[in-house]
UniProtKB/Swiss-Prot annotation:
This is Dihydroxy-acid dehydratase. Keywords: 2Fe-2S, Amino-acid biosynthesis, Branched-chain amino acid biosynthesis, Iron, Iron-sulfur, Lyase, Magnesium, Metal-binding. GO terms for cellular component: cytosol. The active site is at residue 517. The keyword Amino-acid biosynthesis applies. Binds 1 [2Fe-2S] cluster per subunit. This cluster acts as a Lewis acid cofactor. Belongs to the IlvD/Edd family. Disulfide bonds: none annotated.
Amino acid sequence: MPKLRSATSTQGRNMAGARALWRATGMKENDFGKPIIAVVNSFTQFVPGHVHLKDMGQLVAAEIEKAGGVAKEFNTIAVDDGIAMGHGGMLYSLPSRDLIADSVEYMVNAHCADAMVCISNCDKITPGMLMAAMRLNIPTIFVSGGPMEAGKTKLSDQLIRLDLVDAMIEAADPNVSDERIDAIERSACPTCGSCSGMFTANSMNCLTEALGLSLPGNGSMLATHADRKELFLKAGRQIVELCKRYYEQDDASVLPRSIGTFDAFENAMSLDIAMGGSSNTVLHLLAAAQEAGMDFKMEDIDRLSRKVPCLSKIAPNTNKYHMEDVHRAGGIMGLLGELDRAGLIHKNTHTVLGMSMGEQLDQYDIIRNQDEELHKFFRAGPAGIRTTQAFSQDCRWDTVDNDRVNGCIRNKENAISQEGGLAVLFGNLAEDGCIVKTAGVDESIWKFTGTAIVFESQEDAVAGILGGKVKEGHVVVIRYEGPKGGPGMQEMLYPTSYLKSMGLGKKCALLTDGRFSGGTSGLSIGHASPEAASGGAIGLVRDGDIINIDIPNRAINLEISNDELATRRAEQDQKGWQPANREREVSFALKVFGHFATSADKGAVRDKTLLK
């Protein structure tokens, strides 16, 4: 029978000092011997997705205490990618993921916690906590802060829905008036919560449902809705139940590595492909799999992308649907239900509710279960009132969206595309693969041959786009922006947004060893591996080279001979794989990250071989 980890610091005469300190935190005599459960919060006033989380930790803690556990809360950092975007702050975003994972490990192991409830929400916080959960392998439940309501404003006598990406694109268009930009800016982000489309934050929170590590509704229930409160309360109660099953009944099936198996990771990736989620999820799932000691690779993602169709298009891939619409259509359980009916997921994986995924779908899929209370849960909708308060409204749609022919979520027979929403491309430009979010690419340019125009940094690319250097037919190559080369693997939302604002969104392609915001759409290919700083062929491209992109055949190639490629490589080996004429201040902390970082195909995790 597993012994409580916390017994290390709470039992025995030699732990009298530790117990004295525990008592100083408020523990009573009868608390010793109970599981100590870490409530891992991420409240900050810097991030709208986290601004409402201040009281959530104590909400969960109270339920843990009622259920027979001892709750101890601590906080992690949280970076807002949208605020850090477009300047040096973005260099810190991806490294913060690993810092979060380490900080959770430090706190949990230093204090011998028995389990965790992870209160996450935005881009790098959920992945960082997921990496920690897989690393620590103690009972864990995720509960996120929830999505923001979609923005709404009246323009030209028409009510439109929008988000922060609309604000960025419109602001970059010189033909758009200041008045229109101001109206969009003030309406784009109306409430607390993670940005309202299927961007990275919401994609990752949805994926925790598919992994079985969060409760149904976690990825789609609005941050503002009163029903979301029950997810926090239930997480508090359920984590104590998981502790009992593991520590008292020796049931290891409740542990993260038993729930997040290879099959569960396939379920999560299949969901991501079906919903056209952020390409960043690939990076984070690969990283989490490595923490679990699992051999889940780019080739597995490629295999899944060839058989899983695109069943839903959500902002930024369309203006028609946002996360509130996904929830109305049955949320992630609805999407997984359609994948199940198509024979495309594993039903025998476990979930934190103590049932199989198949059993959970029987209970929570609105198509197979017509229970009135279930449908009421998924009718939870937006109020359209600006607020930073969680649980502040109780509005509901009149009906759920169960239209699987033309609705927000389709069945396989009526799929938006039989090609999935993400694809892995291989070729001499990316021998270890690169990622494109096909859900955001117009099918007319799935095959694209263009002329390379090369930039050594995101800043130079932005200047080139806005300065008119980039023309129709160009493949914009932005290199030395990978995990090692940046360092930090910046997101390229500004270059892609500016291409759209300049009328080049369907007339150009963009290739980078950096990554893209979940808000990106268009022919934007990221994660080119190996990256330039690690000797990748993207570092050998020259202005005027012809690049051939073939999404249907999953190929991307530089159209030069092998001999010419070898000659260029030999020349670059002599020069060193460094960006030319780039001025960038890099802090010591970022240099450390870059020194250890692997390329994107490995999840941009640290290279453990450097420590041997």
